[in-house]
């Protein structure tokens, strides 16, 4: 289910007709249709996760993370009452629930409570994800819903929308067009980047093996690189793969709140996932970028 508020990705259109996949245009913030099918597993990944888009649609962002989630949790309670309980319920939260951690909390463990603005331009996303986690914990405690919580850290790979307005999508768009990579910051903020194959493995492990009502970081611990270093890596790899000749240029961003409350560093501690789930991501950022910067992979972003 998806409202497709930002359009339908090409990779999903290509999967139409697959016998084990049904795609429906629905908005989870609306009442669920009746009767509902009997689902064994629920993955709630619906949401607006790109800063420019959740600033454009702040109320829809809040509604998806709270009201849409509540609808699915209530459905799970009703299923249990009918003797058809769901086996697992995965909520995609976010590493943004940590806000801008202090240096002593990098890498950031799940027990860190966060340093988050509740009124800034990112608050509609950050705070609704935090409250979504609270809903998951309460429904697990009060109703026995087998909720598990994943906190993604900068996942990337083939299939990202080129209009996503996040850093790798922005850089890839310029590479595809043969233009210089434009950076709207000083390039100093750092992130770790987890390739989609490793991330998806992590999500399924959280869903199947995670402890009920508990959060798990899904990302990779190293290397923690700056945005400038990321741009340099993409420029070099694209040059090696298909002769890209662009360079990195810096420009001021016309959007005044572009960097307001933007975390300076983002790096997960995944020791809990290793211990509970056997989660051990292994694809380096260089290897992931090389996989994601082939002409075929770049074409999947369009």
Predicted regions and their residues:
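N-terminal Rossmann-like NAD(P)+-binding domain of SDR-like oxidoreductases, especially those catalyzing
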Residues: 1-155
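Residue-level signal for the nucleotide or nucleotide-sugar donor/cofactor binding architecture
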Residues: 7, 56, 64-67, 123-126, ...
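Gly/Ser/Thr-rich beta-alpha loop segments that engage phosphate groups in nucleotides
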Residues: 9, 49, 101, 159-161, ...
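Solvent-exposed, non-membrane alpha-helical residues enriched in polar/charged side chains
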Residues: 13, 29, 59, 137, ...
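Residue-level signature of the cytosolic catalytic core of signaling kinases
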Residues: 17, 104, 120, 160-164, ...
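Hydrophobic alpha-helix immediately C-terminal to the catalytic Tyr-X-X-X-Lys motif of short-chain
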Residues: 131, 135, 139, 171, ...
